[in-house]
Curated annotation (Swiss-Prot):
One of its GO terms (molecular function) is nucleic acid binding. This is UPF0102 protein ECH_0093. Pfam families: UPF0102 (PF02021). PANTHER family: UPF0102 PROTEIN YRAN. It comes from Ehrlichia chaffeensis (strain ATCC CRL-10679 / Arkansas). Belongs to the UPF0102 family.
Length: 122
């Protein structure tokens, strides 16, 4: 049975998933190869892992219906970095790639905002 709280969570999950699908489509149109969508490991998760021209992009997607930008916390950044390191450990063919952490923000009112190299680690 849906409670008001559960209903909101379902809506947020659907909106987030649709935002990720939109960004995947956008990346494919720009010539990126999508390696993984919703990569999860014990250390964290990454929304999208994509590559193009020896660049490996670990991408966080934030989606909002109303246009308010959703911040990414230092804790989330560290979690994504740990998951990225885990991914590369198990997929050694990407060890020589240039690593990038990108942030995509999408809302109906503001459209698409891309922040390449949103943070650094490697």
């Amino acid at each position: 049975m849906f409670t008001k709280k559960n209903y909101k969570r379902v809506i947020y999950n659907i909106v987030g998933y649709l935002g990720e699908i939109l960004i995947i489509w956008f990346l494919k149109c720009k010539g990126y190869y999508i390696i993984k969508h919703r990569y999860k490991c014990i250390l964290g998760e990454i929304d999208i892992i994509a590559c193009k021209n020896k660049y490996l992009a670990f991408i966080e997607v934030k989606t909002s219906i109303f246009g308010s930008e959703i911040p990414i916390t230092n804790k989330q950044q560290r979690s994504i970095i740990k998951a990225a390191k885990s991914f590369i450990t198990y997929h050694t063919k990407f060890e020589e790639y240039n690593i990038r952490f990108d942030l995509y923000f999408f809302s109906l009112s503001k459209g698409l905002i891309h922040i390449p190299h949103a943070w650094q680690e490697f």
